[in-house]
Amino acid sequence: MTQHQDAIAPHGGSLINRVASETQKQDLLAKGDSLPRVQLDKRATSDLEMIAIGGFSPLSGFMGQADYEQVVHHMHLDNGLPWSIPVTLSVDEGVADSLNVGDLVRLDDPTGAFVGVLELTEKYTYDKTQEAVQVYKTDEMKHPGVKVVFEQGAVNLAGPVWLLERQAHPQFPSYQIDPAASRQLFRERGWNTIVGFQTRNPIHRAHEYIQKCALETVDGLFLHPLVGATKSDDIPADVRMRCYEIMMEHYFPEDRVILAINPAAMRYAGPREAIFHALVRKNYGCTHFIVGRDHAGVGDYYGTYDAQHIFDTLDAQALGITPMKFEHAFYCKKTLSMATTKTSPSGPEDRVHLSGTKVREMLRRGELPPPEFSRPEVASELAAAMKA
């Protein structure tokens, strides 16, 4: 393989681009006031952007009923391609009744800004309980993903989209790297194997450990923190990004790591979302994807390693990206280093278990996470942000 070839093809073979050209954009903006409109929530706004930039390839729009049913029940698109999360645009029945198949629908973000259009090809109802149970493994409203499903509209709108305006990420301009751009960066660096890492939490020592373990076996590491909609108690995106900047400056080899933002929203769908996250990183050009403990989980809804086991149920060749599975890492007091049960000689009493949840709890109590939890510079940044 030469430096000028992509290490891996996008999911489905082609990278989707539904970002309107300047000519298209001006034409659509001129029509905007005359179009029927739908207001998107934060998640749908993120989904629109991810579809348009190719992050959700091969999707070119919000799912029709055939794809939706296959994804919910069988984890693949209607054409058989693996896909684990429904990507839909849901509206109330009244809104759906006011629209006709064939309409060009104006899409506004939560502030009312005109951000895209939908070429409406289909309207269909769906079973919310079935979606919740199949995708999230529960129908409890306290699950944040399930809550979204039950509170959204009863009708899904389907069809191709065009994106006119990106979500604003003014604090991260240099990290807004789309799939086409990340692939170009990987080619320029001559990387043939790239491992992606997904997170919604500030980096702690366990994350750093598994990232570096993975980096020992590949050409490059793609750090891809999520900056779309998350739970209200998650650490804000700007704080998480500052922590990663600190790590890049002091603790990672800069020529082996690329940091970029992921504009997607969290679903908290555990095992299914682990597959989804892997496919998204495949579109960004990653050949491998790190799957750790309780990936994309919330509460106690999923088993510790369910998100790893689900990869064994899919055709590896059809999936096309290789999961790198890691056990739960901890700080070993006996060896004074990070380890897992595979490498540590210590018993439970000498293991300091780390998690984003524990870090958040310490910060809320006004405690500075110790060096066993976080690098000192990161701990100071988190503490300062919590006070502010």
From Swiss-Prot:
One of its GO terms (molecular function) is sulfate adenylyltransferase (ATP) activity. It catalyses: sulfate + ATP + H(+) = adenosine 5'-phosphosulfate + diphosphate. It comes from the Bacteria. It is an enzyme of class 2 (transferase). This is Sulfate adenylyltransferase. GO terms for biological process: hydrogen sulfide biosynthetic process; sulfate assimilation. Gene3D superfamilies: HUPs, Sulfate adenylyltransferase. InterPro entries: ATP-Sase_PUA-like_dom (IPR025980), PUA-like_sf (IPR015947), Rossmann-like_a/b/a_fold (IPR014729), SO4_adenylyltransferase_pro (IPR020792), Sulfurylase_cat_dom (IPR024951), Sulphate_adenylyltransferase (IPR002650). Belongs to the sulfate adenylyltransferase family. Its EC number is 2.7.7.4. SUPFAM superfamilies: Nucleotidylyl transferase, PUA domain-like. It comes from Acaryochloris marina (strain MBIC 11017). Pathway: Sulfur metabolism; hydrogen sulfide biosynthesis; sulfite from sulfate: step 1/3. The gene is sat. Keywords: ATP-binding, Nucleotide-binding, Nucleotidyltransferase, Transferase. Pfam families: ATP-sulfurylase (PF01747), PUA_2 (PF14306).
